[in-house]
């Protein structure tokens, strides 16, 4: 299997992106759909999927396939594990609170696979860290949304409001694309897959942007000084 390669830079989002509003018991969720196909990544090197005998073979009861995810208790993983065992493959779903730890864990041999990232994130990780993790398949398509407990409609955000976004390089750029599509920020030039807050023209933008670790963005919605946050699907809970 060949090494992961840098995918083509996606086109800049436009102001006609669909906006979906989902009212829940605890939160008003304002979702601007900027999707990513989540890839399953693996490291094929000195570790092999099969051992010398059946008792130690990778996928056996004594040596399950370890898959790193965020949200191991989600219903889909319970069903996946059950179906895998019916097929004779034992799986250990390893939960991570911080998805930035998953690729290092895969590279070190703590995991056999992980499932959390889109291809751009994986390619950027490989290039930045001189690694060779392999994408072996796509699993799901997730939106990146704007969430708020303060307003019911994205149009209700006020001039000067603060919006938090993930600070990892590729998801930060996606979040900026979401805010641009919603008309909340104006960029100094074109949006790219590696746009940073430095690309934002603060004087012409409606909101202020604060980058934080992805797992912290959702908790900022409880802060009275934060109007909204762009939250990765892994950290969204009703």
Regions found by a protein language model. Name each.
Residues 1-64:
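Short, low-complexity disordered leader/linker segments with a strong preference
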Residues 82-83, 100-112, 177-178, 197-230, ...:
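Short helices/loops that flank or line small-molecule/ion binding pockets
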Residues 48-66, 84-86, 153-161:
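Immediate post-signal peptide segment of exported/extracytoplasmic ligand-binding proteins
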Residues 124-136, 151, 238:
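Ligand-binding "clamshell"
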Residues 136-185:
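A conserved helix-loop-strand patch within extracytoplasmic ligand-binding domains
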Residues 91-98, 188-194, 206-213:
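Short beta-strand-to-loop elements that line the ligand-binding cleft
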Residues 111-114, 132-138:
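Short beta-strand-centered segments that line the small-molecule binding cleft or hinge
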């Amino acid at each position: 299997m060949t090494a992961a390669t840098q995918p083509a830079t996606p086109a800049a989002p436009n102001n006609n992106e669909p906006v979906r509003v989902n009212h829940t018991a605890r939160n008003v969720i304002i979702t601007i759909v900027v999707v990513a196909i989540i890839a399953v990544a693996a490291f094929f090197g000195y570790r092999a999927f099969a051992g010398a005998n059946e008792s130690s073979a990778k996928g056996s009861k004594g040596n399950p396939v370890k898959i790193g995810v965020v949200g191991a208790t989600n219903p889909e993983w319970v069903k996946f594990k059950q179906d895998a065992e019916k097929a004779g493959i034992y799986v250990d779903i390893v939960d991570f609170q911080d998805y930035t730890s998953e690729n290092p864990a895969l590279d070190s041999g703590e995991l056999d696979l992980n499932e959390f990232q889109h291809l751009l994130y994986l390619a950027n990780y490989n290039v930045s860290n001189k690694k060779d993790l392999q994408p072996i398949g796509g699993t799901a398509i997730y939106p990146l949304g704007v969430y708020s407990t303060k307003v019911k409609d994205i149009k209700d955000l006020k001039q000067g409001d603060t919006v938090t976004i993930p600070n990892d390089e590729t998801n930060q750029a996606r979040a900026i694309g979401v805010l641009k599509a919603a008309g909340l920020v104006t960029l100094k030039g074109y949006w790219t897959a590696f746009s940073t807050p430095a690309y934002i023209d603060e004087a012409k933008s409606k909101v202020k942007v604060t980058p934080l670790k992805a797992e912290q963005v959702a908790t900022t919605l409880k802060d009275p000084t934060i109007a909204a946050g762009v939250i990765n699907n892994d950290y969204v809970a009703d």
